[in-house]
């Protein structure tokens, strides 16, 4: 019979109490504490190797005499996932300890560095000004862990990573704690500051479960009680360390309920700590009461949800036991007896900041508000250059010209191009101004091609929104798309290497040739061979990837040589094939694609996609039927661009899909994609060998598009 507890064991309550621990909840610890210890050791080693600021030694980290923090807070994690999430948790500890000593603005910058590192990773070791940048070091530090998590469980890993960034790093310093007057207000803030939502996503990843939004809503009251106990437990046991640190910091920020009670109620330290202790016990009892009510109201809970609820309490208790014994909160006492080993500057010792006194009314630097991280976008410099010639007519407003541009740019994006730029930059180390210029060039060309593609394909939707030409009309959209090509040329001329402009023109020519064949086959109802199709893809899709890689190669100050350029071209060629065939496959397979562009939209367009080409060549008997459908569709569309005439009937699409599935074409296309994915991975290895640098960032890009977990 399946039980609640699969991976953890009891901790003796009397033994725990003898250490000063006073939790009222049962304590459990993961059986594989050794995995958590190894992950902590690796996290500390990697921080020292990649970041190299010494903080891995100054932070208390996750170890303790009674067990690893990861083994207590992830008690029911699958063993093969425990190491990854403990690594991330220990990284959070080091990062948190570091930020506690930084002035407010520097702490914000440090959060931003780590948040960016969680987006992609870095793997560069070459010595240059860019390689020494802290954000690049952080990317290198975190990359292998992120890649490992994605290889274990890509969907949950991405959810966990995004939550870690957006629900913790991007909000943790965003409020002035000294403005708060009530415990409820403080706990609401600490829920964000402590990253509770991000933490539960890590628990879900570890347990390999998915808790729905509805289930989270129903369990929220009891989880909120447990979270309050968790936060206050940390405050209780960390108070002495935080108070001592604040006396030695130029810009002290105490985020602790003990200080809240001292400040708002005029209590002494001992009185305030005792009040926090009482509240911890109260919230633990509240959790137990609400849990029993929840079970009574929901007697037929699925096992995974009951396990999740029980784990919540065990995490609360395990964290308490660890906090009562961990070096992170208590090692400072040893430092007091060994002044020579202190990691703090002795010059500030004994200085008490009046802002930390009970009842102090002065506002700390926490009153400064953090601004959300924003991605740099195209600046106004992309408009027409001002002409200082009185003999030339004054230019009209560019509002009408730029409206379609701004519309397509505002659409949601999966960020693949930005990820690819980051990945290539781990090898090429392009200086930031030129790198930003190249990003803008690629964005211009990509968005221009989207506008034109939608017009040429008569697509009504783009990323779930009305296509640009359906909002602004075909003529205006074409005009704006053409102007974006002009802007791209203007920006390329400003790059340092003169070869960049020739590269741009070469790849644009290639792109238009590829697109011409795609349109030609559709209009003339001709079926290309697989070889002809791949040649078209190499031109149309591969051109954009090659252009990006070549522009960055030309602007790189650390990489040169024809061999490297050839390897980059080969990787981009394979990546372009993988990307395009995957797009063809997902258009017919993916629910997400249907939501974004419409069900099997490629069939509406009469597009010669890879699966369809394979079907038409391998099953001549069905060729006449499908070509007849396309011929009739083309005839209907030519009578007028009405939505009824441009869309195939749903039944017709389902019939074509039945032919594709019945002929095993979708399965063979998936096999082709997996072969291409392996080939791209092999080409990345070739570049890593040639450049002498591993690049897990590029593998993360590939992993985000992986079809290894796709099943038919």
Curated annotation (Swiss-Prot):
Q: Where do the record's region annotations for Prenyltransferase lie?
A: 333-706
Q: Which residues are listed for dimethylallyl diphosphate binding in this entry?
A: 462, 540-541, 580, 587, 597, 607
SUPFAM superfamilies referenced in this protein's UniProt entry, alphabetically: Terpenoid synthases
- Residues where isopentenyl diphosphate binds: 414, 417, 446, 463
**Any idea which positions bind Mg(2+) 1?**
96
Which pathway, per its entry? Secondary metabolite biosynthesis; terpenoid biosynthesis
Record-listed E.C. numbers: 4.2.3.-, 2.5.1.29, 2.5.1.81
Q: Which domain of life is it from?
A: Eukaryota
What ranges does the record give for the region Disordered, renumbered to this chain? 334-373
Q: Which residues bind Mg(2+) 2?
A: 96
Give the motif span (NSE/DTE): 234-242
At which positions is Mg(2+) 3 bound? 457
Q: Provide the residue span(s) of the region labelled Terpene cyclase.
A: 1-332
The record's statement on gene disruption is: Does not affect growth and pigmentation on plateculture, nor conidial formation.
Family that this chain belongs to: In the N-terminal section; belongs to the terpene synthase family. In the C-terminal section; belongs to the FPP/GGPP synthase family.
Instruction: Supply the domain comment.
Output: The conserved DDXXD motifs as well as the NSE/DTE motif are important for the catalytic activity, presumably through binding to Mg(2+).
For this entry, the protein name equals Sesterterpene synthase btcA
Q: Which organism is it from?
A: Colletotrichum orbiculare (strain 104-T / ATCC 96160 / CBS 514.97 / LARS 414 / MAFF 240422)
Q: What is the lineage of its organism?
A: Eukaryota, Fungi, Dikarya, Ascomycota, Pezizomycotina
Primary gene name: btcA
